[in-house]
Amino acid sequence: MQAYQRDFIRFAIERGVLRFGEFTLKSGRTSPYFFNAGLFDSGLALARLGRFYAEAVIDSGIDFDVLFGPAYKGIPLAATTAVALAEQHRRDLPWCFNRKEAKDHGEGGTLVGAPLSGRVLIIDDVITAGTAIREVMQIIDAQGARAAGVLIALNRQERGKGELSAIQEVERDFGMPVVSIVSLEQVLEYLAGDAELKKHLPAVEAYRAQYGI
C-alpha cells in the first residue's frame, strides 16, 4: 500500500465516509462496512479528496485528454481532481460534465465545460452495478470520443449476481481499465495494522470470503 492510499483510508474514516458495523446494501447484502463519499462535504475535505484522486490519476499511468464527471456525484469529483492535477502536478487539463436534463436555452445541450473529445477519463465515487458507467459510455460515444478508463474512490472487490464484480464487467464490456484510490484489499491491510480498528477485521474478512472476487 502506498502512503497516499494509507492517508486516504485514515481520512475517510476520520470523515465518517468509511464506517464499520452492520449495513444493509441496495443489493440486500449485509455488509460489515459502508462507504459514503457524500460525507466529503466541506471545502477542505473536497480539496483534500481531489489531491487523493490526482495521486491515483498519476499512479494509474492512464493517458487521457479530458476529465469527465457524470451527473451528479461525479461533477464535484472531476472538478476537484482537475484543480489538484493543475496545482499539485502542473497538469492543467480540461474537464466537463453532463446534465441529467437537456437545456433548450443558453449554451443548450446536456454537456457543460470543455469539449468531450479524445481520450476521456471518467471520475466517479464507486461502481455498484455499472449502470451509470454504461450510460456515460453512450454519452462519450455520441460525441465521437473514447473512454480511456474510470477512476473511483473505492473498489469493493465484490461479486455481483454472477462470478464477476460490476467493475470487472465494465472492464470486460468496454475494454478499459477501472482503477481506484484504494480497494478492499488495502482497507483490510489498514485494519490489520490499526490496534483500535483491528476488531472489525474478522467480519470484513468473512464478507470478503463470501462475496469477494
Swiss-Prot record:
Residue positions binding orotate: 34-35, 128, 156
Keyword Amino-acid biosynthesis: no
GO CC terms, sorted: cytoplasm
Catalytic activity: orotidine 5'-phosphate + diphosphate = orotate + 5-phospho-alpha-D-ribose 1-diphosphate
Positions bound to 5-phospho-alpha-D-ribose 1-diphosphate: 26, 72-73, 99-100, 103, 105, 124-132
UniProt KW keywords: Glycosyltransferase, Magnesium, Pyrimidine biosynthesis, Transferase
InterPro entries in alphabetical order: OPRT (IPR023031), Or_phspho_trans_dom (IPR004467), PRibTrfase_dom (IPR000836), PRTase-like (IPR029057)
Disulfide bonds listed in the record: none
EC primary class: transferase
Pathway where it operates: Pyrimidine metabolism; UMP biosynthesis via de novo pathway; UMP from orotate: step 1/2
Biological-process GO terms, alphabetical: 'de novo' pyrimidine nucleobase biosynthetic process; 'de novo' UMP biosynthetic process; pyrimidine ribonucleoside biosynthetic process
Cofactor(s) listed: Mg(2+)
Record function comment: Catalyzes the transfer of a ribosyl phosphate group from 5-phosphoribose 1-diphosphate to orotate, leading to the formation of orotidine monophosphate (OMP).
Quaternary data: Homodimer.
Protein name (Swiss-Prot/TrEMBL): Orotate phosphoribosyltransferase
Lineage, opening ranks: Bacteria, Pseudomonadati, Pseudomonadota, Gammaproteobacteria, Pseudomonadales
